[in-house]
Amino acid sequence: WVFDSQINLKGGYSEVTSRGVSKWINSERKQGDSDYMRIIAATIDGRLIALESATGKHVASFGKGGIIDLKEGVGEIQVTSPPAVINDIIVVGSTMGDNWRFDYPPGVVRAYDTRTGNLKWSWDPIPRKSTDYGFNTWIGEKVQKTGAANAWAPISADPANDLLFISTSCPSPDYYGGERKGYNVYANSIVAITASTGKVAWHFQTVHHDIWDYDIAAQPLL
């Protein structure tokens, strides 16, 4: 079979690459069943798609007819890396053209149930509340509108320890930090997240207050 995701080729995307797809084995099915294995793909026009690997058809029970609109509630994001699949959870980051303005969409990482597509958790790499860790590392009146710090590189997964390892990028805009003074935790960081809860286990920031577009572009190697 051949599957065409029907992407709008005139969408004016900031990125036009796709680094692959992922798979999930359904432990509630046996090999040979149409829904034994699913192909999980994310598109540059911001959709998460689940297909039956045997037929190439959308999984009707996933999201809305096999599709989730990742832009809903977030904004003009794209996805260029394959989703991570860990312990019946799909985890997806995003990419965006983050050097055009400061108020870009947030670089949220989201986790979905592999069977239903229901949202399990979302994590914003920019602390928005005073009770969030790292909130005091973002200083400025416009910080609440600062976007990006997104995870556009592939995400690594350690199922045995229930951990995800996420590489984040610089905040928006890339080359001017006057509206986001401070260290800007969790931008430009390797972040370990508990997959089942979406809570941060630990992080290491490679660049404090990035104004050079020093995204962590590589997938963490375990």
Predicted regions and their residues:
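Extracytoplasmic/lumenal domain signature
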Residues: W1-G11, I25-R29, L48-V74, V108-K145, ...
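Repeat-blade elements of multi-bladed beta-propeller folds
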Residues: E15-R47, G75-R101, V108, V143-E179, ...
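Short Asp/Glu-rich motifs
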Residues: F102-D103, D132
